[in-house]
Amino acid sequence: MKRLLCIALTLALAFTAANAQEALKKVYNETVDPMEQIDNALTKAKAEGKFVVCQVGGNWCPWCLRFADFVEKDSAVNKTVSDNFELIHVNYNPRKSAGEASADKAAKLMKRLGNPSRFGFPVFVVLNEEGNVMHIQDSSFLEEGKGYSEKKVLRFFNNWTPKAVNNNR
């Protein structure tokens, strides 16, 4: 009887965890060309006096989806991001199973962004108005428990706003 109860409890917890994962909105467009996505974001950001933040990851990454959800729901973070950045979700899929073209695109993307995959996912790449990499942020430093720390995330974004960067020039 105890064994059946343990099995039932384990299955219930697994089902709950799977549903929680599915509840997060999938924010990565897997059909868009990431290079074009970055170029379009740079054009828009430059016109608005903003920088671009590339959140590199994929719909396969629970922490990537958690961060997108966090930014959307935390009003202070959302305002800081929308006032200073063009935030884009850049899909990364290096697997050969996705096709040779996809693997080649992934390699070119990593080269363009300064090889941010070495930090894990999600990883954030801040680009200035010219498209130059200014900073690569390891997301593990922004985590707190099973989510993200508002204080740490705001510190990261506030340190890389156009105003913060340009005041030091």
Stretches with model-predicted labels:
Residues 48-62, 87:
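Short active-site neighborhood of thiol/selenol oxidoreductases, capturing the structured segment around
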Residues 34-52:
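A short beta-strand-turn-helix
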Residues 64-82:
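Typically the conserved alpha-helix immediately C-terminal to a functionally engaged Cys/Sec
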Residues 112-166:
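Non-catalytic, surface beta->alpha helical segment in thiol-disulfide oxidoreductase systems
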Residues 18-32:
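N-proximal helix/coil linker or "cap" segments that precede and/or mark the start of modular domains
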Residues 32-34, 77-106:
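Thiol-based oxidoreductase modules, predominantly thioredoxin-like and allied folds used
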Residues 61-64, 124:
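The canonical Cys-X-X-Cys-His
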